[in-house]
């Protein structure tokens, strides 16, 4: 059990608050302009897990061997804590609601695998199959099967220590949706329908809020994100150096993203009362003054809701390299160089609503457009990078000192935003909806209708220009000093030379500063 309490002064003008979690019109708490609040979070997590493993091996002739392994694991977890709570007269903000962890059902995750390994003096092959799943009270079983195959083949070797090996691999790895995606925070939209505050008489106030509570917007069709990767490489060794190079291709499907939806609702807006010493009251679902119902207008608005979706798709390919150039004896310094060339294409196919917040004669714009792009200028990006790290490691065992000097270089960096493979300066929505909530395809005729003109999404042409930065680098250092077998003191400094060059971004027409500011630190490690 744990509790966290915070106190803070709220310096805001008088506000209205309700803790109602259902849609409707409610009499609100009128908050004072300055108050202290206390926010309590009580968590009582629990979990139960079990795991079973089994393995065996079968020696064969000529130093060959086959080994088998299998396993299963299960974990159940939940939380019985009261969660987030506070004094309703002193809320941390006017948009927050209490939320108990008990509202979130227990989560059950499981995984099983089977693996076979074949070994010879020159060949090592691993083949496996893994299945992982997730189950909760409100969701059907979410699961994914992940095959993989790895190979290491010694092509040639010599007694003097020269070897060349081929490595290859193919496999899947999946990522289950998190608890926050399965059970997101419920959405509440509070509109002020009526507010009266008699400045001449303390306590003569009345506030009415209309709450629109679409609730917890869950996506019952949420799937795991799946990464598929293929790689092939060579490993070469000599008595002095080791070189490892890998070519890879990776494809991600059903990546997690969010889709912005807009749900319409209606609310009352009562006439404003400016006369002092009135006694408004709320009864029978209506505001009354001196026995007369206060007139109101019926208005419409939208509540934005973010729904988790599987719409992110990413492709990567590149070359990785690690070279251990050995130790230079006079200096007792070894040099390790690693680098990568990486090209990434990413596209998000989520359908997102955009509501132009325009007011005409104090009336909110009645239409929402739905576009095949996020809030930015496009829906896909392409990037390319070439980088290397040079690590100089100096060891002085006699005094227990290890110094690591790292020179990081970005030789090439390119980035570009696109809209469906091209530019998208002027984009009309694919769909639209009005205050009735019915979604319609957007037609050519509506492009000519002035009523729909605010739905045209415009973007400056330069936002789609490619960005390309000149090389830049950074120098880091780390010094470790051992005091006996149990104590190690480390000093580190990042961006030691304060290299912070600026590079011009064509898409934003601005200069961006690269690298972080220099920072230093000490670490103390004690082993008992």
Annotate each predicted stretch with a short phrase:
Residues 2-6, 58, 74-80, 120-122, ...:
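Transmembrane beta-strands of outer-membrane beta-barrel pores
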Residues 46-52, 108-114, 129-133, 145-151, ...:
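Hydrophobic, lipid-facing positions within transmembrane beta-strands of outer-membrane proteins
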Residues 60, 119-125, 249-251, 268-419:
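Gram-negative outer-membrane beta-barrel transporters
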Residues 50, 66-72, 123-129, 147, ...:
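Transmembrane beta-strands of outer-membrane beta-barrel proteins
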């Amino acid at each position: 059990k744990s509790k966290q309490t915070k106190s803070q002064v709220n310096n805001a003008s008088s506000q209205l608050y309700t803790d109602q979690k259902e849609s409707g019109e409610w009499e609100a708490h009128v908050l004072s302009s300055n108050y202290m609040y206390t926010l309590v979070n009580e968590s009582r997590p629990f979990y139960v897990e079990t795991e079973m493993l089994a393995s065996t091996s079968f020696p064969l002739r000529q130093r060959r061997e086959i080994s088998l392994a299998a396993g299963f694991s299960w974990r159940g977890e939940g939380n019985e804590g009261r969660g987030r709570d506070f004094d309703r007269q002193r809320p941390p903000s006017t948009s927050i609601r209490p939320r108990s962890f008990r509202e979130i059902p227990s989560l059950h995750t499981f995984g099983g695998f089977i693996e076979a390994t074949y070994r010879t003096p020159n060949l090592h092959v691993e083949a496996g199959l893994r299945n992982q799943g997730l189950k909760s009270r409100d969701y059907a079983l979410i699961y994914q099967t992940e095959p993989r195959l790895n190979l290491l083949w010694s092509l040639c070797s010599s007694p003097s220590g020269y070897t060349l090996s081929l490595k290859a691999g193919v496999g899947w790895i999946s990522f289950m949706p998190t608890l926050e995606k399965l059970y997101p925070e419920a959405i509440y939209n509070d509109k002020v329908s009526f507010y009266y505050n008699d400045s001449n008489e303390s306590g003569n106030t009345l506030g009415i809020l209309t709450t629109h509570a679409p609730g917890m917007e869950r996506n019952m069709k949420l799937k795991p994100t799946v990464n598929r990767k293929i790689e092939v490489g060579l490993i070469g060794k000599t008595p002095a150096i080791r070189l490892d190079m890998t070519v890879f291709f990776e494809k991600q499907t059903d990546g997690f993203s969010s889709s912005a939806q807009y749900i319409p609702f209606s609310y009352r807006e009562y006439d404003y009362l400016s006369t002092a010493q009135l006694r408004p009251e709320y009864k029978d679902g209506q505001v009354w003054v001196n026995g007369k119902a206060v007139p109101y207008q019926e208005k419409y608005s939208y509540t934005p809701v973010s729904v988790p979706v599987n719409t992110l798709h990413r492709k990567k390919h590149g070359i990785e390299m690690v070279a251990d150039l050995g130790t230079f004896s006079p200096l007792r310094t070894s040099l390790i160089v690693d680098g990568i060339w990486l090209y990434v294409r990413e596209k998000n196919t989520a359908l997102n609503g955009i509501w132009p917040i325009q007011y005409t004669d104090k009336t909110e714009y009645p239409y929402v457009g739905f576009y095949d792009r996020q809030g930015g200028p496009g829906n896909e990006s392409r990037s390319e990078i070439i980088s290397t790290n040079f690590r100089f490691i100096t060891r002085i065992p006699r005094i227990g000192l290890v110094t690591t000097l790292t020179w990081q270089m970005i030789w090439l960096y390119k980035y570009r935003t696109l809209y469906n493979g091209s530019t998208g300066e002027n984009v009309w929505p694919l769909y639209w909806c009005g205050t009735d909530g019915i979604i319609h395809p957007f037609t050519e005729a509506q492009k000519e209708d002035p009523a729909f003109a605010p739905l045209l999404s415009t973007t400056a042409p330069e936002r789609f220009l490619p960005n390309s930065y000149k090389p830049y680098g950074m120098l880091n250092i780390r010094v470790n000093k051992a005091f006996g077998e149990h104590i190690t003191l480390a000093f580190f400094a990042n961006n030691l030379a304060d290299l912070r060059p600026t590079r011009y971004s064509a898409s934003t027409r601005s200069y961006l500063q690269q690298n972080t500011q220099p920072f230093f630190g000490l670490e103390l490690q004690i082993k008992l």
